Curated annotation (Swiss-Prot):
GO cellular component: cytoplasm
General function of this protein: In muscle, parvalbumin is thought to be involved in relaxation after contraction. It binds two calcium ions.
Gene Ontology MF, one: calcium ion binding
Species, as recorded: Squalius cephalus (Chub)
Binding annotation for Ca(2+) 2: 88, 90, 92, 94, 99
Name of the protein in its database record: Parvalbumin beta
Residue span(s) of domain EF-hand: 36-71, 75-106
Entry keyword annotation includes Heme: no
Length: 106
């Protein structure tokens, strides 16, 4: 997925397997997304933005891990809200492409 190594994805998912253990910074670093080009980050955004609205909404964030591996757990409500708050720089309740890119590189 996203041109990432399968072993890195597996390790990153394993590290946040327990409920409420997801940390976006640690996850992006572990899967190798932090080092990806702007083009690759945009491709990832477009996949996560399932309804193609140009934004990643709360419901799409909740299923974030499943974009990396089918059958991965959904994020808890608490994790989803923390993730959304971290990425939603303008406070509109959703994450745009620029906000997502900043979140990945943070």
């Amino acid at each position: 997925a996203f041109g990432l190594k399968e072993a890195d994805i597996t390790a990153a998912l394993e590290a946040c397997k327990a409920a409420d253990s997801f940390n976006h910074k640690a996850f992006f670093a572990k899967v190798g997304m932090s080092a990806k080009s702007a083009g690759d980050v945009k491709k990832a955004f477009e996949i996560i933005d399932e309804d193609k609205s140009g934004f990643i909404e709360e419901e799409e964030l909740k299923l974030f891990l499943q974009n990396f591996k089918a059958g991965a757990r959904a994020l808890t409500d608490a994790e989803t809200k923390i993730f959304l708050k971290a990425g939603d720089a303008d406070g509109d309740g959703k994450i745009g492409i620029d906000e997502f890119a900043a979140l990945v590189k943070a």
